[in-house]
């Protein structure tokens, strides 16, 4: 075999491999070329190799203690059997290597010898190299002697082997080992005692190197999971080693995980069959499927039980709702169950024990919506038919207010609370909507001098949620047009739908942005709406003292909101064209507008500057006159309103 490997290696050194080898030998000068060739064959990716060498997951071939004669063939064959697993996996990829075929023949012997080679590993474990490293390394090299082709070294996506490798901590991996061990145990009880003792030592040692895996699994798995977590390639074979150790003496298993014994027995049988039928990996799929179904259905039953109990207790108050909710709930559980089964069958053989976990996880999120629905009485998270249920529940709760459209109105809160909430919401919206087009903003009419004020808001306003003294209507009800209170109905629907339309007034959200607020001067008494403050942004921040933030913002005639600031730096761009003398000329020319007069108390420089600007902008102002274009401000000379809309 090894000779074969050498030839192959000399034949097959293509440029890529050479490049990798050079890089690696630069990085790790103490590694020999042969070892590196093995690694390059094993792992395609350069990064992976470097990673493995630095973490010590792979060690140099020559460091492993030379196996004695008896063990040498054993380890060869062990790796052959490994390759046979891989070969089976390869059927998926259909890249079969002719060299591998002997492994099928040798497969029967593999287990026998494996147990011996394992004892060798555990004896060696005293020399300070971790068992895993040695074992990993041996496996690397043996594999490569055996299997030069890159393809055959990649784990293929076939049943239990490769997947067990990928979930380093999965029960499936442990069970797979269990199964193999079981066979070996039957074959050779003779070697079992010595190995059992060694295996316990070895386990304790390799525990130090394991990545954290599931708690119950840990003792059996260590040997297997560390190499796996470092390399998926070796999963199967390291598994088999772990197996021999952990398993040749069943008692230790029983001690470690007696709780799972029933499952494990089932598992053993299945896996044993699977082992025998290796060449036809999917034969015993049905048996497995049954088992999975059984597990998952047990689980769903429990899950459903838990789910359906709680809503039922809480749902008694809402009879209707519960009847509607039940179908949805069952539907969901069915979905959960089926998806669960599909999931557990996909990784076909691997995960027979996984259903427990995944099932719990799956039912949990399903149950949440139900519980919240039941608790709130109104479903926040609605599936399919449940919103019907919610609507009807509302209808039944509001049965005492038999208005035709009542069913659509949001649930009524006690009136005082509703009024407060509405007031708050509208206060918020008042500020929100100030600067949006297409509304008439109540802020505009706050100072009663505004012409349209009396017409728009002449009618006394009653906050939405409250009822006028004479009116015995439910909060959501529109008074009939003829009634003495019709006036309120009409003003209320000034922004909402007109009262004839069969909409509940409440369905139009807070109709006017701030209907309740229109009592004069309610807002901390600025007599002027934001609309007339100058805006430097198109969005709706109220512009109080923003001059500092926006370089081109200038005070206008009659506004002292902005402290005068020396504008020369801010306005640098426009100033560049003019010299000081020009500015003074202009001043002498008597061009002081009203704006200048107002700015007179500011510094001399400021005045000159401002005036220069006026001179710049006059032509533009004339062009703009009469265009409703700097919408947010009536002062068309303002720098800021130009160009935004």
From Swiss-Prot:
InterPro entries xref list: CUE (IPR003892), DEF1_CUE (IPR041803)
Modifications after synthesis and translation: Ubiquitinated. Proteolytically cleaved by the proteasome in response to transcription stress; the resulting N-terminal form constitutes the activated nuclear form and the C-terminal portion is degraded.
Localisation: Cytoplasm; Nucleus; Chromosome, Telomere
GO cellular component: chromosome, telomeric region; cytoplasm; nucleus
Signal sequence annotation: none
Gene Ontology MF, one: DNA binding
GO biological process, one term: DNA repair
Region entry Disordered, spans: 57-421, 452-521, 555-645
Main location class: cytoplasm
Compositionally biased residues, Basic and acidic residues: 60-81, 140-153, 176-190, 280-292
Residue span, CUE domain: 16-58
Polar residues composition-biased segments: 118-139, 191-204, 294-307, 373-383, 634-645
Biased composition (Low complexity): 83-95, 162-173, 264-279, 309-327, 336-362, 395-421, 454-490, 509-521, 567-626
Keywords: Chromosome, Cytoplasm, DNA damage, DNA repair, DNA-binding, Nucleus, Telomere, Ubl conjugation, Ubl conjugation pathway
Family, per entry: Belongs to the DEF1 family.
Function: Recruits the ubiquitination machinery to RNA polymerase II for polyubiquitination, removal and degradation, when the transcription-coupled repair (TCR) factor RAD26 fails to efficiently displace stalled RNA polymerase II. Also involved in telomere length regulation. Binds DNA.
Assembly notes: Homodimer; may form higher order oligomers. Interacts with the large RNA polymerase II subunit RPO21; the interaction is direct and serves to bridge RPO21 to the Elongin complex in a manner dependent on transcription stress. Interacts with RAD26.
The name this protein goes by in its record: RNA polymerase II degradation factor 1
Organism of derivation: Kluyveromyces lactis (strain ATCC 8585 / CBS 2359 / DSM 70799 / NBRC 1267 / NRRL Y-1140 / WM37)
